[in-house]
Amino acid sequence: LFDAGYSADDVRRADLVLRVEGPEGFVLEGSSSMARISRDPVDLAAQAIGANHQYPDGFVLFLGTMFAPVKDRHGPGQGFTHAVGDVVTVSTPSLGALANRVRTSDTVAPWTMGAGALMRNLAARGLL
C-alpha cells in the first residue's frame, strides 16, 4: 500500500534483513538489497494485474527470494529447514519489522481477514 510517505522508489531502495531464531538456539541471519533484483517492482506489478487479472482487494507481490540459506541446521550436509517454534523476522528501517512464529497449519486459526476487511476496519475507525 503506497501513500505520500512511501512509494515504489522506497521499495526500490529498501535493504532487508531476515533473521531466524530457533527454540534450540539456532540463529540464521541474512540481508538483501532490493536495488539488486533483476526486474523493477513496478514492471512486475504491471505484469501481475491488468485487464486479464483483476484483484478487487489488491494483491501481495512477492519479489523473490532474499537469499538461499546455506547454514546447516541439524548437522553437516543436512541443509536448512524451518522448525516449529522458529521466530522469523523480516525488517527494514523504513517499515519496521514483521515477525512470525512457525507453527503447523493444523494448529493455527484460519486466516479470515483480507485486504478488503482491513480497509473497511480502518475506514470504520476513521483512519483512512
Show where each model-derived region lies.
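Catalytic-pocket segment enriched in acidic/His residues
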Residues: 1-128
